[in-house]
Regions:
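Juxtamembrane/interfacial segments around transmembrane helices
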Residues: 71-80, 98-103, 126-136, 201-212
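Juxtamembrane helix-capping/reentrant segments at transmembrane boundaries
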Residues: 67-87, 108-120, 205-224
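Non-catalytic, topology-defining segments of multipass membrane proteins
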Residues: 1-54, 83-180
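Active-site recognition of the HExxH zinc-binding catalytic motif
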Residues: 57-64, 68, 100-101
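Membrane-helix interface segments
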Residues: 37-42, 69-76, 170-172, 223-227
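Cytosolic/matrix-facing juxtamembrane and C-terminal tails of multi-pass cellular membrane proteins
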Residues: 198, 205, 227-233
Length: 233
């Protein structure tokens, strides 16, 4: 088998779909046991966060059109997978992620904000909002053909759901099952996949801007290999 054929995207990557189903199972199970059995959030939060963490692998693959050779399928699945992440549409995430690849460790890299460690990683959502809206203004695409940018509309709609939740008395469930897990999950993902691989964020060469993790997570020991395998699905 040639290298091109070996790594060519198949008609459909079923393993990625299985991971998507697994991630959604965690996330939806947390919603079910919370709403039906009133299980305390101390138990549902970890379940929701595990779901969000698991879903990141297929979300990442969708941004690179790696789930299917059909781009429409990638986009459709991406729009479904992004739902638990609350703060962003799939198109917004794709733009930010591809900007990271285009400008890794440079000033224009949206993930460079994570360089201060866990504290900055937990604030990544605010930074991403600033980065994305600033890019819309600079590209003069906030309004297109007389209509508000669809990604802005998506974000407004999500926050409108929060307002509706407040009015009908389910705001606590929305926060516990959707917003807080998304906030924590994104912070955790940022730390593991933004800060750790690129920490010190000084190298911009494509062969040196990513580094391995020393210590418990080092790839040179059996424990590290097992942990990395779990973290990266």
């Amino acid at each position: 088998m040639t290298l091109d054929k070996k790594y060519k995207v198949q008609n459909f990557e079923w393993n990625t779909l299985y991971i998507t189903v697994l991630g959604y199972s965690f996330w939806l199970l947390a919603i079910y046991v919370r709403l039906i059995y009133q299980i305390h959030y101390i138990y549902t939060l970890p379940l929701s966060i595990v779901g969000i963490y698991t879903l990141f692998t297929p979300l990442h693959e969708a941004t690179h059109n790696n789930i299917s050779s059909n781009k429409l399928i990638n986009q459709t699945l991406g729009n479904i997978i992004i739902i638990p992440y609350f703060f962003s549409s799939f198109e917004t995430f794709t733009y930010i992620h591809l900007q990271h690849h285009a400008h890794t460790n440079k000033d224009k890299d949206p993930d460079k904000f994570s360089r201060f460690g866990m504290i900055s990683c937990m604030c990544m959502i605010v930074h991403y909002y600033y980065y994305y809206f600033n890019s819309l203004v600079q590209r003069n695409v906030c309004i297109q053909n007389g209509y508000l940018n669809q990604n802005i509309v998506y974000i407004i709609c999500n926050w409108f759901i929060v307002c509706i939740g407040y009015m009908i008395g389910i705001l606590n469930h929305i926060f516990i099952l959707w917003i807080i897990p998304s906030f924590i999950g994104i912070g955790l993902l940022s730390y593991i996949f933004d800060y750790l691989p690129h920490r010190n964020h000084k190298h911009i060469d494509k062969y040196t801007h990513t580094k391995m993790t020393d210590g418990l997570l080092t790839l040179n020991n059996k424990i590290g290999n097992n942990i990395i395998s779990i973290l990266t699905c």
